[in-house]
A protein has these predicted regions:
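Extended, solvent-exposed regions of the mature portions of secreted/cell-surface glycoproteins
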Residues: 1-208
């Protein structure tokens, strides 16, 4: 206890022992890219504590997708879209110090897309697909050579076995149909498409 005034003199004191805290994490060893993994945890569950999926070898203050233990046990976390080696970690909220960790393998996922090689401009393209079919995933009809974050007309793969119907652009040319993951727009399947021009003719009497 410090008194006010010059020098803040100590008027009273008592010993204090600070004990360390611990945590543990239990989860599957692997998860598909973009999937959800359930993590059972033990730990202090203090305000701001969080459990994260981080790149292998990342420092304590570097973290990826995360959730708060207070949200539940087990805690559901979304895996990254990029396959590779990661680590699950329990961080203290105030210092980000890691109390517990365990390795996690994020496996690659793929998709297939089937449709006619040509389509008429302005028409509708029915795309049969296989893939994760997660909420927010989408199938797009894009300009050939477009970046993953650039997409054109699209549809959601709503139900397995039901083709996704996408409106074909009005401009003929070379395009690509792509399956994008929801969170990163990462492409896990693609196939080329040629959009062909359509013509029309009119016949009528010369005068009425």
């Amino acid at each position: 206890y410090h008194a006010g005034g010059s020098g803040y003199p100590v008027l009273a004191k008592a010993p204090l022992s600070v004990t360390d805290v611990a945590a543990s994490l239990e989860a599957a060893a692997s998860v598909p890219a973009g999937g959800t993994i359930e993590v059972k945890w033990t730990g202090p569950n203090d305000q701001g504590d969080f459990v994260s999926i981080d790149p292998a070898g990342a420092p304590d203050r570097t973290y990826g997708n995360y959730g708060y233990p207070a949200k539940g046990n087990p805690l559901a976390l979304k895996a990254p879209d990029a396959a590779g080696d990661y680590v699950l970690r329990y961080h203290l909220g105030d210092s980000y110090r890691v109390l517990a960790s365990r390795p996690l393998r994020v496996g690659a996922v793929g998709a297939t897309l089937e449709f006619p090689a040509q389509a008429n401009a302005g028409g509708t393209l029915a795309v049969r697909w296989t893939g994760p079919g997660r909420e927010g995933d989408f199938i797009s009809l894009d300009a050939a050579g477009a970046g993953e974050q650039t997409y054109g007309n699209y549809a959601y793969p709503e139900a397995a076995g039901r083709p996704a119907e996408i409106r074909v652009p009005d401009e003929p040319g070379d395009y690509v149909v792509r399956y994008h993951l929801a969170s990163s727009y990462g492409v896990i399947g693609s196939a080329p498409l040629t959009v062909e021009a359509v013509t029309a003719s009119l016949t009528a009497p010369a005068q009425v």
